UniProtKB/Swiss-Prot annotation:
Family: Belongs to the TRAFAC class TrmE-Era-EngA-EngB-Septin-like GTPase superfamily. Septin GTPase family.
Gene name of the record: sept2-b
Function summary: Filament-forming cytoskeletal GTPase. Required for normal organization of the actin cytoskeleton. Plays a role in the biogenesis of polarized columnar-shaped epithelium. Required for the progression through mitosis through regulation of chromosome congression. During anaphase, may be required for chromosome segregation and spindle elongation. Probably plays a role in ciliogenesis and collective cell movements including convergent extension during gastrulation.
GO cellular component: cell division site; ciliary membrane; cleavage furrow; cytoplasm; microtubule cytoskeleton; midbody; septin complex; septin ring
Source species of the chain: Xenopus laevis
Compartment list: Cytoplasm; Cytoplasm, Cytoskeleton; Cytoplasm, Cytoskeleton, Spindle; Cleavage furrow
Subunit details: Septins polymerize into heterooligomeric protein complexes that form filaments, and associate with cellular membranes, actin filaments and microtubules. GTPase activity is required for filament formation. Can form heterooligomers with other family members and form filaments. Interacts with wdpcp.
Chain ranges passing through the membrane: none
Residue ranges of domain Septin-type G in the record: 33-305
Record's protein name: Septin-2B
Record-marked site positions (Important for dimerization): 155
Gene3D superfamilies on file: P-loop containing nucleotide triphosphate hydrolases (3.40.50.300)
Residue sites binding GTP per the record: 43-50, 77, 103, 182-190, 240, 255
Length: 352
């Protein structure tokens, strides 16, 4: 066997074509390209949303944030703040966008306070639909909201009317994951009681939250057990902290109280690790549900109404359209020139 032949055959496995290597090709391409994910966090002020997000991704997304005083909250309106950070771990890049909603639920009158949030979600669908219909489809940035952590106060006896209204208004647009904040303010018994109450109310009100898919039959038993535990933990009761404290002779992230220490990453203390595991292991599924269900529903409605409407805050100028068309024209001209050069070479070799 020649050296060149050996490079393209596998003598150890006769009849092997190579299709089994296709997943590796997809993996390498995905790693080179990197991943995009958009997470929205919604909930009243003071529930530790920013702290939890910083704890989840070991980063500081809000270094310059100023917390408004009580007087400023009375007439405060909902703002939309999107922060993007590039995270790299073992050669894998993640472009994470966290959409925060300061002002939600703070004002005395909270009627329609969630409408700016719904407008933002719809606007990202509009952007994506517009980009899909454009010339430069290869380089579409996906800013659609793939998941929404909805923070529920631990101080009530279940869902507030605003919680119900918001989730029902958004559940056909975004994957909602309910989170009970500040779990360290509850005893274990109170925690379980509140979880059951929230789940019962979600079912009674017909609210559609994100349901983890069942593990496949060919998955290993550890993964099946992990999936079962994650499903049983919804809604997740969490504690966030960026402070390192000493517990049992080691440094851990947690909160120090006169009665003891609450460790953020201790599954016996709260569901922080389960929430992070759910997000990481089901990130692809969250994106697929967004694409195949929520976005397709939005797209179908838009097409029924006669195509994409105007996108808020996005001005497609004539100059931009001309630049796109000129770039496309240049690519076509270059392709034609290459084809002509190849034909000329073939013609010359034929004459010889």
């Amino acid at each position: 066997m020649s050296k060149q032949q050996a490079q393209f055959t596998n003598p150890e496995t006769p009849g092997y074509v190579g299709f089994a290597n296709l997943p590796n090709q997809v993996h390498r391409k995905s790693v080179r390209k990197g991943f995009e994910f958009t997470l929205m966090v919604v909930g009243e002020s003071g529930l530790g949303k920013s702290t939890l997000i910083n704890s989840l991704f070991l980063t500081d997304l809000y270094p310059e944030r100023v917390v408004p005083g009580a007087a400023n909250k009375i007439e405060r309106t909902v703002e939309i703040e999107a922060s993007t950070v590039e995270i790299e771990e073992r050669g894998v890049k993640l472009r994470l966008t966290v959409v925060d909603t300061p002002g939600y639920g703070d004002a005395m009158n909270c009627v329609d306070c969630f409408k700016p949030i719904i407008s933002y979600v719809d606007n990202q669908f509009e952007r994506y639909l517009h980009d899909e219909s454009g010339l430069n489809r290869r380089h579409i940035v996906d800013n659609r909201v793939h998941c929404c952590f909805y923070f529920i106060s631990p101080f009530g006896h279940g869902l507030k009317p605003l919680d119900v209204e918001f989730m029902k208004a958004l559940h056909n647009k975004v994957n909602i994951v309910p989170v009970i904040a500040k779990a360290d303010t509850l005893t274990l018994r109170e925690r379980e009681r509140l979880k059951r109450r929230v789940l019962d109310e979600i079912e009674e009100r017909g609210i559609k939250i994100y349901h983890l898919p069942d593990a496949e039959s060919d998955e290993d038993e550890d993964f099946k057990e992990q999936t079962r535990l994650l499903k049983a933990s919804i809604p997740f009761t969490v504690v966030g902290s960026n402070q390192l404290i000493e517990a049992k002779g080691k440094k851990v992230r947690g909160r120090l109280y006169p009665w003891g220490v609450v460790e953020v990453e201790n599954p016996e203390h709260n569901d922080f690790l389960k929430l992070r595991t759910m997000l990481i292991t089901h990130m692809q599924d969250l994106q697929e549900v967004t694409q195949d269900l929520h976005y397709e529903n939005f797209r179908s409605e838009r097409l029924k109404k006669g195509g994409a409407s105007k996108v808020e805050n996005v001005e497609v100028t004539k100059d931009q359209m001309l630049q796109e068309k000129e770039a496309e024209l240049r690519r076509m001209q270059e392709m034609i020139a290459r084809m002509q050069a190849q034909m000329q070479i073939q013609s010359q070799s034929g004459d010889v």
